[in-house]
Amino acid sequence: MVPVLLSLPLLLGPAVLQETGSYSLIFLYTGLSRPSKGLPRFQATAFLNDQAFFHYNSNSGKAEPVEPWSHVEGMEDWEKESQLQRAREEIFLVTLKDIMDYYEDSTGSHTFQGMFGCEITNNRSSGAVWRYAYDGEDFIEFNKEIPAWIPLDPAAANTKLKWEAEKVYVQRAKAYLEEECPTMLKKYLTYSRSHLDRTDPPTVKITSRVAPGRNRIFRCLAYDFYPQRISLHWNQASKKLASEPERGVFPNGNGTYLSWMEVEVPPQNRDPFVCHIEHKGLSQSLSVQWDEKSKV
């Protein structure tokens, strides 16, 4: 058995792109040995940068583009993509079974995951990843510089032997990451650059609540912004306040992101509070003051 991506020839031809920038194409695969009722045994999602652009699962057997790519004609032959994903599904689940057989656990509930893809910067290949995990633990990864599969789990030594049974398998894996994947990404970018390069400014909402002990907690919520990077902090009387660390930036379910910052102050502190936001979608930093009338 050969690695997942080497089972079928690449379906896309060469493409040329002259513009500069950094972009990535990443595939995420998940296989389940005993899926719960209604859940697919195998799922795949492809991402352009951080934006999902198609899903596939074993229940439907179809690769289906998501918004806005579902309205883009010519980007991909989705029937051929469905055939490719069905072939990858079969090989992926065979690998999961092989691992379970190694551990003599043919009936257990286990998860096998894969992530692979590439990045281009200024129209040149600038990075790649190809690795797998079993039950949430690193299993095996491909090092394209050696090139070789690197076992990260006892069972992975057996997988390495199969995936390196012929030298050509390793060379094709290297070629996929360095040549074929970037070519595919460049083609996709001819249809996707405007969407990936967009800037959606954040919508900002400030709320407050009384915490135990009667201190007041102010929250500055920013949402519906893209790209992901954003800076939030609280000011009072032109002084930056000590506040809890950013909780992070989270997907908003619509291709944008949300984040928030909180600060806790004693009830006697009545000076105005201002939330400062910096984001690529804003022409200048945004300052939003807490309004007592909007208290919730």
UniProtKB/Swiss-Prot annotation:
Glycans are attached at N123, N254. The modification Pyrrolidone carboxylic acid is found at Q18. Pfam families: C1-set, MHC_I. Residues 1-17 form the signal peptide. Keywords: Disulfide bond, Glycoprotein, Pyrrolidone carboxylic acid, Secreted, Signal. The keyword Heme does not apply. It comes from the Eukaryota. Its main location: secreted. Disulfide bonds join C118-C181, C220-C275. GO terms for biological process: antigen processing and presentation of endogenous peptide antigen via MHC class I via ER pathway, TAP-independent; antigen processing and presentation of endogenous peptide antigen via MHC class Ib; cell adhesion; cellular response to insulin stimulus; cellular response to magnesium ion; detection of chemical stimulus involved in sensory perception of bitter taste; immune response; positive regulation of T cell mediated cytotoxicity. Expressed in liver, but not in a wide number of tissues, including prostate, mammary gland, kidney, intestine, lung, pancreas, ovary, uterus, thyroid, placenta, spleen, brain and heart. It is found in: Secreted. The keyword Glycoprotein applies. SMART domains: IGc1. Residues 202-287 form the Ig-like C1-type domain. GO terms for cellular component: external side of plasma membrane; extracellular space. Interacts with PIP. Belongs to the MHC class I family. PANTHER family: MHC CLASS I-RELATED (PTHR16675), ZINC-ALPHA-2-GLYCOPROTEIN (PTHR16675:SF289). Stimulates lipid degradation in adipocytes and causes the extensive fat losses associated with some advanced cancers. This is Zinc-alpha-2-glycoprotein. It comes from Rattus norvegicus. The gene is Azgp1.
